[in-house]
Regions:
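Short, charged/polar connector segments at secondary-structure boundaries
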Residues: 1-111
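Amphipathic alpha-helical extensions and coiled-coil-like segments
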Residues: 2-7, 15, 25, 41, ...
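Short hinge/gating elements
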Residues: 46-54, 122-127, 254-265
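Short, contiguous strand/loop micro-motifs
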Residues: 51-52, 81-82, 128, 139, ...
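Short, Lys/Arg-enriched anionic-surface-contact patches
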Residues: 75, 123-137
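Short, ordered loop/turn segments at secondary-structure junctions
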Residues: 111-114, 160
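Switch/connector loops and helix/strand junctions flanking conserved nucleotide-binding motifs
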Residues: 116-119
Length: 268
């Protein structure tokens, strides 16, 4: 631990150890259920500044609004003080659902958290929440990297992913805004996005248009991207031709054939 004035600031190793744990957010929220919650006017709570551009689909907001009207709040929101207002840390869907439902005051636990810890909480939440959007994880990882110098390996350890997966997730941020919007709204999956980031320029525009018009699956989108990269015709509803080179050897006695594939992907 290190001291900054009178405030104790967790070290990087302590933060990583804490937020790399499974279900750290679920445990945290369970602890907050027993803590005294404070009713805060909804009008005084602002969305988290880090992921405010990630739009929650209207149907999801409406579903949460209906649930809150029927059952009320089970878990309080987690917020932090920002001057005379409050900034949301966790509970975005409940927050926007409550606003749509017209709920005027919300139970909140006010947490004293610096920006780095807030981002780590958001990353752990997207990691543990299967319904979270991959673009949200990309935005959080990018900010941890640019603001606090987190390496891709550290982000991979925190996210329980491989370094190459983190690289692919971060590449999504380079996609044009209309594509990122479709990812946010759930119209395109991470698999679709991964196929699209391998393209640029006119090829990217072409692939995006075809994927939307023909409602291609992830596998079909990958075949389309492969065809565009290699300037080959895209054959819908067909398996890609696997290419291989080198020796094709056989043994009369063992009745075997040896194929040398061009890549691990072709072999699989």
């Amino acid at each position: 631990m290190k001291r900054e004035g009178k405030k104790v600031v967790p070290s990087l190793s302590n933060l990583i150890e804490k937020f790399s744990q499974e279900d750290v957010i679920a445990v945290m929220e369970k602890e907050y259920q027993a803590a005294p919650a404070r009713l805060i006017p909804t009008s005084l709570i602002d969305d988290t500044s880090f992921i405010k551009d990630i739009v929650i689909p209207k149907d999801v907001v409406s579903s949460f609004a209906a649930g809150l009207k029927e059952k009320g709040f089970y878990n309080p929101l987690i917020v932090r003080s920002k001057g005379d207002r409050f900034e949301l840390i966790l509970g975005r869907k409940r927050f926007f659902g409550a606003k749509k439902a017209g709920i005027l005051s919300l139970p909140c636990v006010v947490r004293d958290a610096e920006d780095e810890e807030v981002l780590l909480m958001l990353l752990a939440d997207t990691r543990d929440n299967r319904s979270a959007n991959v673009l949200e994880m990309a935005v959080v990882c990018k900010q941890l990297s640019s603001l606090f110098g987190y390496t891709q390996q550290t982000l991979a350890d925190l996210s329980h992913l491989s370094r190459s997966q983190i690289t692919n997730i971060l590449r999504i941020l380079s996609l044009p805004d209309p594509i990122k919007k479709d990812i946010t709204l759930g119209k395109l999956s991470y698999g679709h996005a991964r196929a699209l980031v391998s393209l640029d320029g006119e090829k990217l525009e072409t692939a995006y248009k075809i994927i939307n018009e023909k409602k291609l699956s992830v596998r079909e989108s990958e075949r389309l991207a492969h065809a565009l990269i290699n300037n080959e015709p895209y054959l819908e509803n067909s398996e890609p031709i696997i290419s291989f080179s080198g020796l094709i050897s056989s043994s009369e006695r063992e009745k075997s054939i040896t194929l040398n594939f061009n890549s691990k992907e072709d072999k699989e």
